[in-house]
Amino acid sequence: MRAPGMGFFRMPLFIWSLYGTAWIQLLATPVVGITFLMVVADRLLHIGFFDPAQGGDPILYQHLFWIYSHPAVYIMILPAMGAITEIITTFSHRTVFGYKAIAMSSLAIAFVGYLVWGHHMFTSGM
């Protein structure tokens, strides 16, 4: 909850980084849950999502793994980057140069970090 009169571009940069992280978690976490259910169904019910002998695709597992695991890196680093920015500005008694650019880049990192899992798939084929 923001204080009265606090607009979006007056919030601390830590909050911007948490906002980007929240969107990544909201979009990426269901994928890991679905992947887990598919692996359980594959192992216990012998459905064959990932078994080539049953018509499955092992590359699908790699895609589902990286669709979650690549954004997970940014889930860990974005809040730390926001916290470090706040700590440095607080103890140096200075304002942040390029506040809007840093706020938007936090969201851009979250957005792009979610979309670029494919670069992990170059060696196995897309």
Summary of predicted features, one role per range:
Residues M1-M126:
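Membrane-embedded and interfacial regions of multi-pass energy-transducing membrane proteins
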